[in-house]
């Protein structure tokens, strides 16, 4: 969205059909527009911060992170969601559900933003269990375990919404269904 104007929306069904994370698709498409308009593309972190309306806090964590997928994909998480290894999520033993973290791989300085939706890990000394997609963004999928530093993020603006406000132009009159709307 630009102001109150909807530029595009990604249906959850489309991202599933493409086998791609909806956040990454939204960022790629937004960056295609930005490049066409001779504007710097956004990094993954910049896009996620804008998409979720987040800002950094002073609370930091560090430790060892692993990732989980395969066997758990499609199973129930501790907060009642169905686990999707392609989402930007993380398990933590005590952080409140829906807490956002900016996690940085200390070996290569790559970062990703994840949302707490599960409990774990339960193997010492690990303190985070990342989704497969989050691990890929940190280049930790093959190593399996990585030292990290994380910053707790807090909301500073409205999050993306599943139902956009009613269209104000005739060309949007046929917009239907549940949409994933990006506002960055």
Regions found by a protein language model. Give the residues of each.
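Exported/periplasmic cell-wall-interacting domains
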Residues: 76-184
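Non-catalytic extracellular/periplasmic "stalk"
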Residues: 1-56
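Short, basic/aromatic beta-hairpin or loop at an interaction surface
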Residues: 61-83
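A general structural-boundary detector
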Residues: 52, 67, 121-122
